[in-house]
Every structure is written in C-alpha cells, then in structure tokens.
C-alpha cells in the first residue's frame, strides 16, 4: 500500500505522520517512511537546492525539473522496491504537490506538469492520499511559530515567504484534486489541536476498506 500526506504550509501533516505510522503498524503494516523532496541520498542534495534561500531567483521551470528529478530517483530506488517487498510506503508529499505548487500556484503549463509527473512516477499513484486542509492564514501562523521555535531566520524560508495569494492557490489546487479523485483522497479538517486532528485522521482511516493487513 502506498499512502501520501499532502497539505499547504503549516497543515500539520509532518506532525501527524508518526501517529499515522503507529496506526498502520497496529493494523499489521510494515512501514517505510519517506518524504519528497529528499527521500534518497541524491534527493537530499536536490532538496538542499530547492529550499536554499540563496536560490530565491530559481525559475519555476527549474524548480519543476528539480522536483521531477528527485521523484524519478525516489520512485525507482526506494518506493517501488519497498512496495515490491510488500511494505507500506508512507510519503510526506508526492506528485500532487508538484501539480498544485508548480502548476496551480506558479502558473506553469498544467499539461507539462502532468507529463513530467507521469514520467517521474512511472505511472505509480498513491492508493490513499491524506489531505490536511485548513485556511492559509491558519497554516502560515503555525508554520511561522514552528520556524521561531526552531530558531530559523525568516529569510531562510523560501515557500513560507510567498505571498498569501500563492498559498491560496495551493489550497484551491489541492481541493480541486480531491474533488476530481474522491476515491483516493481523504480530506481531513486540520484546524485545532494536533490530538483532535489525529482523532479525525484515525476515524477516517478506519472507514477505508482493506486498511487491515492479515
């Protein structure tokens, strides 16, 4: 089984990921936890390029191709081998993020984005995508609080520094994907304390057919 977590900045998906893994392991899954960008050694180098604030002049096209390169390596060297071994892969962001960030928010040609995604993924799609949804204002408030706790400088946060309209387009893009693929997406209200959000996530997962592994 292949499960991905998606959401705008500050949606809380990374916070919920360990809770998700605990739930899956209690239901018989052997989990491999990964992320994009940066799920492989090569991918970690690409991640550094993508998130480096010194690269604030990176063109949208460059950004798109770097994400595609990261994903192509990730799918072929980690995701597909783990799935072939019968493991459950849990990934913090995947191809949907590229469609909404580079397509919806950056305004790149959507057909180009989708073609690159198909090549990079080799046609692999998640079985379940958990979309943690909340208004951008609330998500960015959380994100900046996390950044302050971690001692990062505001100038070091390339995506958080985008205008509010950018984050609104990201949210709209995710919700559009969820409307188009309701059989794959599970939309979770991400407002409120982490424990409450976790409860909503678990309740939603318990309704998913075949979530139990023999």
Swiss-Prot record:
Keywords: ATP-binding, Kinase, Nucleotide biosynthesis, Nucleotide-binding, Transferase. InterPro entries: P-loop_NTPase (IPR027417), Thymidylate_kin-like_dom (IPR039430), Thymidylate_kinase (IPR018094). GO terms for biological process: dTDP biosynthetic process; dTTP biosynthetic process; dUDP biosynthetic process. It holds the Pfam family Thymidylate_kin. It is an enzyme of class 2 (transferase). GO terms for cellular component: cytosol. It catalyses: dTMP + ATP = dTDP + ADP. It comes from the Bacteria. GO terms for molecular function: ATP binding; dTMP kinase activity. ATP binds at residues 7-14. Its EC number is 2.7.4.9. Phosphorylation of dTMP to form dTDP in both de novo and salvage pathways of dTTP synthesis. Belongs to the thymidylate kinase family. This is Thymidylate kinase.
């Amino acid at each position: 089984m292949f499960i991905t977590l998606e959401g705008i900045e500050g949606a809380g998906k990374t916070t919920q990921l360990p809770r998700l893994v605990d739930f899956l392991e209690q239901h018989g899954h052997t989990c491999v936890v990964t992320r994009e960008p940066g799920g492989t050694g090569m991918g970690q180098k690409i991640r550094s390029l993508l998130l480096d604030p010194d690269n604030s002049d990176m063109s949208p096209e460059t950004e798109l191709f770097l994400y595609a390169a990261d994903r192509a390596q990730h799918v072929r060297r980690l995701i597909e081998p783990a799935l072939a071994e019968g493991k459950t892969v849990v990934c913090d962001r995947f191809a949907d993020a590229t469609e909404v960030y580079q397509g919806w928010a950056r305004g790149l040609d959507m057909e180009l984005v989708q073609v690159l995604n198909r090549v990079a993924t080799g046609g692999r799609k998640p079985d379940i995508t958990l979309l943690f949804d909340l208004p951008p204002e609330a998500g960015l408030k959380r994100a900046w609080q996390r950044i302050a706790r971690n001692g990062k400088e505001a100038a070091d946060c390339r995506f958080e520094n985008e205008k509010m309209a950018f984050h609104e387009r990201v949210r709209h893009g995710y919700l559009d994907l969820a409307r188009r693929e309701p059989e794959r997406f599970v939309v979770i209200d991400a407002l409120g304390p982490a424990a409450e959000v976790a409860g909503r996530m678990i309740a939603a997962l318990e309704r998913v057919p075949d979530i139990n592994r023999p």
